[in-house]
Amino acid sequence: MAISKRGDFANPQKSPWNFEKFQSDLERKMMLRLESDPHVQKWMKRHGIVIPWIDGQKHQRKYSPDFLVEYEDGRRVIIEVKDPSRMDSPDILRKRKSAEIWCKQRGMEYVMMTMG
């Protein structure tokens, strides 16, 4: 299980904000990775995207994905980071399916990944 470590990522160079909040060590590690990736033009955690999805009890929910990333080749990608132990959770899979459809309708990509 991921360590729940929250905090501020100060002065990111590729985010339009002067800080970004992280909710876990996985998110913090992804921020470091995005900052160092020469192909990433811009990334943000505070992007305002909310994706509707239906849970196992057929209730509509809303989900805000972890990152919106813009690459130098023009691709816009939503990245969700998860602990490996949660990748196959039924609700995570439902969110993923909804996010993939949402992104496809907007010419974007969706990637779910884990980080060690």
Specify the residue positions occupied by each region the protein language model found.
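Electrostatic, structured charged patches in enzyme active sites and in nucleic-acid/phosphate-binding
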Residues: 1-116
